[in-house]
Amino acid sequence: MSELAVGKKAPSFTGINTQGVKRKLSELVGEKGLVLYFYPKDNTPGCTTEACDFRDNYENLKKLGFNVVGVSRDDEKSHKKFTEKQNLNFELISDVSGEICEKYGVWQEKVFMGKKSMGIVRTTFLIDSSLKILKIYPKVSVKGHVMQIMKDIEELSK
């Protein structure tokens, strides 16, 4: 994997969405860009809070020209249940193999309650319409994250 950095091209990928349809990165980008966020697991407290925050601000992000897509290693059946339960209005991409997570460098060793394990480190990438990375948000804290993204999009648009 090449080093991901602001100004570099976002790694291309093809993933399966909630409806079982193959979607390419290039098909997911909005008029001005994409908010691509990686999260550990469907229907867990932090991931639900984050997804609902994106859901509640989706129209505002669309007005700014950005689409939202979430990626985790859950399968499409899990994503479908999560989408229905939380009434999500954006696509989730299933990365069961972990290939997309590896390309974006978010599959890492984590420590929880003293135990080490591999997992997705909550990370968001702001990508422009030409698929260049505008901003990387590593080790995301859920609270206030979506508001920060919208603020950053507005700043970058000036």
Q: Which residues are covered by each model-predicted region?
A:
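Chalcogenol-based redox active-site neighborhoods
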Residues: 1-158
